[in-house]
Curated annotation (Swiss-Prot):
PANTHER family: TRNA (GUANINE(37)-N1)-METHYLTRANSFERASE 2, TRNA METHYLTRANSFERASE. It comes from Plasmodium knowlesi (strain H). Monomer. This is tRNA (guanine(37)-N(1))-methyltransferase. GO terms for cellular component: mitochondrial matrix; nucleus. Its EC number is 2.1.1.228. Belongs to the class I-like SAM-binding methyltransferase superfamily. TRM5/TYW2 family. Pfam families: TRM5-TYW2_MTfase (PF02475), TYW2_N_2 (PF25133). One of its GO terms (molecular function) is tRNA (guanine(37)-N1)-methyltransferase activity. S-adenosyl-L-methionine binds at residues 394, 432-433, 459-460, 603.
Length: 698
């Protein structure tokens, strides 16, 4: 064992050196987590103190009337300081105290720039000032004196002869103040300092020590965060073509525009150059930059949070337990659209896929509205499952499904798939066992003015059994006769559903509703007034509080629906059950002849495979071994039923898992099956969807 240790000792030292080098570069070190930079971060005030920083950099001293001309130059603009919420042009009067005493340095840099431009082929004579004296090196090193020294010696002599010393001093002060008022400072960034250093070193010259040379991540483009768009610097990276022999581009050769254009402007316009020291802090940084500053080795983990309307949902690992509240305060403070920051306390294990919420910062308000593909979605995040990260998958399904398809969504949540696909004139049967989700499905149908979505609050098995009873899977069935509940009667438009024209609108349903009712409703005025009042509560404006929404429960069996609604008043303790007639239904005929394939959506990755056995009855009904009285195979009389079954699996086992579960539940495998990776839940757990035609299962 001792000899084994001696053999491993050199490797141990190499590993330690590697970890140290990674930590110095601010890179992740796998299991070696360095958190010492954040140990004393307790409050937002601590954060603001920690992120204070200074930049010492070059700046241009420009007359205010020439600033716009300078800023318009795209190549020059690349080298201007661009800091979040910090002005790119400063008033000299306000920042005079930030200018540094540099001795001969300013003049040396200016002479270098002028001579460099002349060697490249001129650049024009600058307008105004004493160009020759600057080019020869006779440059005043105090900027305040530089901007005042515009009068000729003859003018100064005449004034001195005519005025007393006191008057002369007063006049000089006035001229100095006026000159300072007209001057602006344009700070330059680390890219300029870096590129200038490279150029001057090639000629044996050095730039001042202590200048900012740190190229921020923002210098290479905008910074983005998964689940949400962050406010950030908009640093322009203009692609510039140039010929050989011009000014070198600098350290990032091939990406930076040449300094030549900026040098020419400095010489032509008689612009001074100086050194300025600027203070930056919390207000000049976005969320991403602040978190990188505090947690330099861990920030990529923190940044991955989900946005649900005004709610930011974070998933913290244990090592951030002591910092989660201050991180939440940063996110809340730096993103004005965020009002609530929460942490997920546990995994999704219950029937309704909800989780315990820990409020970290902001309002305790989980009723939110979000927008996806021009669809408004209202939900209570505490009561209903929602995942913004599945937007790409919802878009993929939308592109996959043809117009006039039939959608069967077993685990619909707030109904986002149906809300989206109803744009394509699809007839949608949308179900969720969560009564809160069912309630918001109906709210969102009204909110988005959808006309072809039928909603159900059933166990998935009972839901599919109901559809089997309606025989919507038969390709020979052209008319679907069914009884609709009051809620679904309000959700749909028969004119819209029964017309292949997507622009068709309902013109008469509301007027003939009473005459179409199968059930009997008492006709007296008092009863109608009560029902109207409750309808107002049930279909209140979407800006009303959640307490005024129905917590409706519906039970449907073989095409007949019963509904019982529960109303909440502003006082949570007062609850009244609506005596809306449970047996009131509406007989409707739906033209199935205009609809094509059926798409069954099973987005419950944890257990969706377990529900596939529901469709065994369908396979038995349309068996390949049975023929009708005309001798046709029964399977040919079945519509195409495309199954989209979502599941979790390890990346190395996903196909075997899908095949095993499908064979187990359906007793066979489809001829063809497509499996698509949806997203990575963790390194060893991915989400997939298995897609196949149920008609092809043998």
């Amino acid at each position: 064992m001792f000899y084994g240790f001696l053999l491993l000792y050199p490797l141990l030292s190499l590993c330690l050196e590697h970890v140290i080098s990674l930590s110095k570069k601010g890179k992740p070190t796998l299991g070696f987590v360095i958190m010492r930079n954040a140990v004393d971060i307790k409050t937002l005030s601590d954060v603001k103190d920690r992120v204070k920083n200074e930049k010492r950099t070059h700046c241009l001293v420009v007359n205010k009337y020439k600033v716009n001309d300078v800023l318009k130059n795209k190549e020059a603009k690349f080298y201007f300081l661009n800091v979040f919420r910090f002005p790119s042009v400063l008033k000299l009067r306000e920042y005079e105290g930030n200018l540094m005493e540099t001795g001969q340095y300013n003049g040396e840099v200016l002479r270098f720039i002028h001579s460099y431009v002349e060697r490249l082929g001129g650049g024009g004579t600058h307008v105004g000032g004493k160009a020759d004296s600057k080019a020869d090196g006779k440059v005043n090193h105090d900027v305040s004196d530089q901007v005042v020294a515009q009068q000729t010696d003859q003018q100064m002599d005449q004034q001195m002869d005519q005025q007393t010393d006191q008057q002369m001093d007063q006049q000089m002060d006035q001229k100095r103040d006026a000159a300072l008022e007209d001057c602006r400072l344009i700070p330059l960034n680390a890219r300029f300092n870096k590129a200038l250093q490279e150029l001057m070193q090639r000629e044996g010259k050095e730039i001042m020590e202590g200048l900012d040379m740190h190229l921020e991540e923002g210098d290479a483009g905008n910074v983005t965060v998964e689940g949400v768009a962050m406010e950030d610097d908009s640093t322009a990276h203009d692609s510039v073509q140039r010929n050989e022999g011009k000014t070198p581009k600098g350290p990032l050769d091939g990406q930076w525009p040449p300094l030549e254009e900026l040098f020419r402007i400095i010489k032509k316009e008689g612009i001074q150059i100086s050194i300025i020291q600027l203070q930056f802090g919390y207000d000049n940084m976005n969320t991403s930059e602040i978190l990188r500053k505090i947690f330099p080795t861990e920030s990529e983990v923190i940044h991955k949070y989900e946005m649900i309307g005004h709610i930011a949902h974070l998933n913290f690992c244990e090592r951030f337990e002591n910092y989660k509240k201050v991180i939440a305060e940063i996110i809340l403070d730096k993103n004005k659209s965020i009002k609530t920051v929460i942490n997920k306390m546990d995994t999704l294990k219950n029937l309704h896929r909800t989780f315990n919420i820990e409020l970290l910062a902001g309002e305790k308000n989980y009723l939110t509205t979000l927008k996806e593909n021009d669809i408004k979605v209202k939900l209570n995040y505490e009561l209903i499952y929602w995942n913004s990260k599945l937007k790409k998958e919802r878009d993929r399904i939308y592109d996959l499904v043809e117009n006039n398809s039939i959608i069967v969504d077993l685990f619909a949540g707030v109904g986002i798939f149906s809300l989206h696909l109803s744009k394509k004139k699809c007839l949608c049967f949308s179900n969720d066992i969560n009564s809160h989700a069912y309630n918001f499905m109906n709210v969102n149908i009204k909110l988005n003015k959808r006309k072809s979505i039928l909603t159900y609050n059933l166990d998935a098995r009972a839901f599919v059994q109901m559809l089997l009873g309606l025989d919507i899977f038969s390709s020979d069935k052209t008319t679907l006769s069914m009884q609709l509940s009051e809620q679904n009667w309000k959700n749909i438009s028969l004119d819209f559903i029964n017309s292949p024209d997507q622009n068709n609108v309902d013109t008469g349903k509301r007027k003939k509703r009473e005459s179409d009712r199968v059930g009997h409703v008492d006709d007296d005025i008092t009863a109608n007034a009560t029902i109207d009042k409750k309808k107002k509560l049930r279909h209140a404006d979407t800006n009303d509080p959640l307490e005024e929404r129905p917590l409706g429960l519906a039970a449907t069996h073989h095409g007949e629906e019963n509904i019982q609604s529960v109303e909440r008043t502003n006082n949570d303790s007062e609850k009244t059950k609506e005596d809306a007639p449970r047996d009131v239904t509406h007989q409707v005929d739906i033209n199935l002849g205009i609809y094509g394939d059926i798409h069954v959506l099973m987005n419950l990755p944890q257990t969706a495979f377990e529900f596939l056995d529901i469709f065994r009855e369908l396979l038995d009904t349309y068996s390949t071994d049975q023929k009708d009285f005309q001798g046709k195979c029964r399977r040919d009389q079945m519509r195409n039923v495309f199954i989209h079954c979502y599941f979790f699996s390890k990346p190395e086992l996903f196909y075997e898992d899908a095949e095993r579960n499908i064979r187990m539940q359906l007793g066979g495998l489809p001829r063809e099956m497509k499996i698509t990776e949806i997203r990575k839940v963790s390194p060893s757990k991915l989400m997939y969807v298995a897609e196949f035609n149920l008609k092809d299962v043998f």
